[in-house]
Amino acid sequence: MCGSSTSQEDVDKLLDGAVMDLCVTDPPYNVNYGSLQEQQEKVGKSKNNHDKILNDNMDDESFHLFLYDFYTQMMRSLKEGGVYYIFHADTEGLNFRSALKECGGSVKETLIWVKNALVLGRQDYHWKHEPCLYGWKEGAGHYFINDRTQTTVFEDKVDLEKLTKDELIEMCKELMEEQVPTTIIHEDKPMRNDVHPTMKPIKLIGRLVKNSSRPKENVIDFFGGSGSTLIACEQLGRKCYSMELDPKYIDVIIDRWEKLTGEKAVLITE
């Protein structure tokens, strides 16, 4: 649905009375990502999509309130014991954690997504990971897959045999440039973010969905972005409720879903 994740009216319209079992979402990081990508492209360091992300360049107080309003809707939508995964930037870690606590949530663990390539920036250490807050709504036990091998670090290796020639060339260029200190090493991420500037790998999202929900359960993504959560749910037999504020990314999500399923999306209401 095209709407705001901070609006109770919009969220109620999306849910239509349904209760969510799981939330996997990737809110704006408040890092003005589109502007950074434009600068990198000017010096030949980036060829990724650099469209602006809405609500990604706020002052501290406004961003905290934005997160508070989103968390309020998230906690309201989840069943007791419903799990949430919140990707975020370490630079805004305090806001992400404190706003969650103010809404009655808590951080049980912080997971680390380790990428296979650094993100170029102006800081001394180039970022090569993203944290993800993990927790659940109090009031009942939460579901977790019967697997005691899970760790807080996701390190999916790149399958070189499956990469195209262009992807291999791109990876070699990144590796040649990567003679700098990084926060941490290894991961598999999209070689090019052609449809969304911060697109998450479907495999990464799929792991979280599989770990914390059962087939046919309801999964909500308050910031649909490129549609990776919806695609992962489609592949794993979950029902996804996805909200996205920007109409152009609504089109991206629909296009990815139609290509995956071979079906045609239907507009329910204007």
Predicted feature residues:
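Core catalytic lobe of class I
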Residues: 1-250
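Short alpha-helix adjacent to the SAM-binding motif of class I
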Residues: 248-259, 263
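Short mixed-charge
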Residues: 263-270
